[in-house]
């Protein structure tokens, strides 16, 4: 039981740090960002809305992308990696931002 509490605390800290870092990364000229109740909504005109949310019961972050669809990121050594391909969440968003740039013509 104590291990589960420690794991949950570690997850909550890592999730908070990751959401804070994502909020900074997404604060750019492409869209508008809202961060409320541990959910980030990032809306890009002409592309759609991203949603990033904590899922404490399974210790994951879930992402909904208007470009690539849904993804689940599990915690590995205090970082979140995509469950299907192992990509770290910050790298995932770097790639998404590149796709947005191409879609919007580098505006």
UniProtKB/Swiss-Prot annotation:
Highest taxon above the source species: Eukaryota
**SMART domains this protein is in?**
Frataxin_Cyay
Q: Where in the cell is it found?
A: Cytoplasm
Gene3D superfamilies listed in its UniProt record? Frataxin/CyaY
Q: Is-annotated flag, keyword DNA damage?
A: no
Classification via SUPFAM superfamilies: Frataxin/Nqo15-like
Biological-process GO terms, alphabetical = intracellular iron ion homeostasis; iron ion transport; iron-sulfur cluster assembly
Q: Which Pfam families match?
A: Frataxin_Cyay
- Keyword list, A-Z: Cytoplasm, Ion transport, Iron, Iron transport, Transport
How the protein assembles, per its UniProt entry? Monomer.
Q: What does this protein do?
A: Promotes the assembly and repair of iron-sulfur clusters by delivering Fe(2+) to proteins involved in these pathways.
Record-stated family: Belongs to the frataxin family.
What name goes with this protein? Frataxin
Q: Which organism is it from?
A: Trachipleistophora hominis (Microsporidian parasite)
């Amino acid at each position: 039981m104590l291990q589960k509490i420690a794991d949950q605390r570690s997850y909550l800290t890592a999730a908070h740090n990751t959401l804070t870092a994502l909020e900074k990364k997404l604060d750019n000229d492409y869209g508008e960002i809202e961060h409320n109740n541990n959910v980030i909504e990032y809306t890009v005109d002409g592309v759609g809305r991203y949603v990033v949310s904590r899922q404490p019961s399974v210790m994951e972050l879930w992402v909904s992308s208007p470009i690539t669809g849904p993804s689940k990121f599990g915690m590995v050594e205090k970082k979140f990696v995509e469950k299907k391909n192992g990509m770290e969440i910050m790298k995932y968003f770097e790639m998404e931002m590149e796709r947005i740039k191409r879609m919007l013509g580098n505006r």
